[in-house]
Every structure is written in C-alpha cells, then in structure tokens.
C-alpha cells in the first residue's frame, strides 16, 4: 500500500534508538526526507552511516532554550513524530523532584514545544500536516512503580486531544499511539526475566509483546493521508491490553 509519504519532510524525536530510529528508517524507505533528533551524537552518527541523507540534530529536549535554538533552523516539516521519552521508575512514596522535573520536561513539555515549532511552520506555509505522539498503555492503566511515567503519559493523552482540537482548523491532524511493551533491544533486556514478563503477558489477550514494526507501521499510517479523517485519536498497539 502506497502511503503517499514520498517527498514529504518529517521530523522525528528520540530518533537514536528503538522506535524512533526504526521510524526514521521506515520514513526514508517510503521516500520521505527526515530530520532525526536525538540527544546522543553517537547514535545519530550511526544512524546517518546506516541511512545517508538523514538530517541529524543533536539536542537535549529537556532544555527549552537549546531546543528552541536547535530546531529554529531545521526548515519546514510536513510530519512530526514526538517519540522522545524517559521512563524513571519509582514507587509513589519514593518519587523524587528530579524524576518529576526530567519526566515532565521530556515526556510532555518537549512535546508541546516541538509541536508548536513545527505546527507554526505548517500554518505559516498554509499546508496541511500530521503529528503523531508516541504514548503508552501506561497513559490509561496504573502500573506499579510507574507513578511519574503513567502521569506524564496520561497528560499526553489529553494533550493529543487538545492539539487536535486547536490545530484541526489549520488542517493539521494529531493522533497518538499507545504501545504495550515493545521488543526493542532495551525492551528485550528489560523484560528478559520470564516471571516479570509473564505477569504482563497474562494481561494481554494476544499473549505477546509488540514488535517494533507493529508500532512503526501504525505511526506511518497515522502520518499518511490514508488516515485523513482521523484526528484526536489514540490507537492502541497493545494486543488487547486496554480491553481487559
């Protein structure tokens, strides 16, 4: 299926590893131009070696001023994938100020800032666009030791709807994806304990975790005109976890 992404320009945050990196590669394979944003220079260098033509931007999205400066000169974008996130796991009674500040800065505030920059460019050019926020099943289910992470993703759930409401008149669609555990290299490591994995798998009707391509395919669909009447939605990629 041709998603019509060829020739369009996309910006992807959290592009150095995992879902973000795979999204960059898939967009390039579909013919899009891609700006890849990561805080880790080594990851960007490796990505450019694998996929020449990707435009790398190295910046820590937790730093508002640095982000403003770094993204002010990247040029116009038709598509945006807000994928960058941190997961600092602490039980409620042990949540620290540092965990709150870092998590909300990256998981929520940066989404607002980057989306503002990109959306203002779309509006100034008078072109339609699409934004996909990579959220989590944790946005709608309480998970032990995920107090701050669940809270930031819950806020992102409503932010997605607000962005859709206010950007819709400018022909900018905004949606989110809610993956379950995803088998990125980090995901495979973090969920390698069979007992830990079983506790989560028992809550997933399909009985398996998501592969990276399951999430990436959903992101590309939401970026494409094939989902042209879809905005303000959050699409689970969770094997039925949220149905239980």
Curated annotation (Swiss-Prot):
One of its GO terms (molecular function) is L-xylulose reductase (NADPH) activity. It catalyses: xylitol + NADP(+) = L-xylulose + NADPH + H(+). The modification N-acetylmethionine is found at residue 1. The keyword Cell membrane does not apply. Keywords: Acetylation, Carbohydrate metabolism, Glucose metabolism, Membrane, Methylation, NADP, Oxidoreductase, Xylose metabolism. CDD domains: XR_like_SDR_c. Its EC number is 1.1.1.10. It comes from the Eukaryota. Substrate binds at residue 136. It is found in: Membrane. Gene3D superfamilies: NAD(P)-binding Rossmann-like Domain (3.40.50.720). The modification Omega-N-methylarginine is found at residue 21. Its main location: membrane. It is a peripheral membrane protein. Highly expressed in kidney and liver. Expressed in epididymis. Expressed at intermediate level in lung. Weakly expressed in brain, heart, spleen and testis. The active site is at residues 149, 153. One of its GO terms (cellular component) is cytoplasmic microtubule. NADP(+) binds at residues 11-39. GO terms for biological process: D-xylose metabolic process; glucose metabolic process; xylulose metabolic process. Catalyzes the NADPH-dependent reduction of several pentoses, tetroses, trioses, alpha-dicarbonyl compounds and L-xylulose. Participates in the uronate cycle of glucose metabolism. May play a role in the water absorption and cellular osmoregulation in the proximal renal tubules by producing xylitol, an osmolyte, thereby preventing osmolytic stress from occurring in the renal tubules. Belongs to the short-chain dehydrogenases/reductases (SDR) family. Homotetramer. This is L-xylulose reductase.
């Amino acid at each position: 299926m041709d998603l019509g992404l060829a020739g369009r320009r996309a910006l992807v945050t959290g592009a150095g590893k995992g879902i973000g990196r795979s999204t960059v590669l898939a967009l390039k394979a579909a013919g899009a131009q891609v700006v890849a944003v990561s805080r880790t220079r080594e990851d960007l260098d490796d990505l450019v070696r694998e996929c020449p033509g990707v435009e790398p931007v190295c910046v820590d999205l937790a730093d508002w001023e640095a982000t403003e400066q770094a993204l002010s000169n990247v040029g116009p974008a038709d598509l945006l994938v807000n994928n960058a996130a941190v997961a600092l796991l602490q039980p409620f009674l042990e949540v620290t100020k540092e965990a709150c500040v870092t998590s909300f800065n990256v998981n929520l505030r940066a989404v607002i800032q980057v989306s503002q920059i990109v959306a203002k460019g779309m509006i100034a050019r008078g072109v339609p666009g699409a934004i996909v926020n990579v959220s989590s099943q944790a946005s709608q289910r309480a998970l032990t030791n995920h107090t701050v992470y669940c809270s930031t993703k819950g806020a992102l759930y409503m932010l997605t709807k607000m962005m859709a409401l206010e950007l819709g008149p400018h022909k900018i669609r905004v949606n989110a994806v809610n993956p379950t555990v995803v088998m990125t290299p980090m995901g495979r490591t973090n969920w390698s304990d069979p007992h830990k994995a079983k506790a989560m798998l028992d809550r997933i009707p399909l009985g398996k975790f998501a592969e990276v391509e399951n999430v990436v395919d959903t992101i590309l669909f939401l970026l494409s005109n094939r989902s042209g009447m879809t905005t303000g939605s959050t699409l689970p990629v969770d094997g039925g976890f949220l149905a239980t």
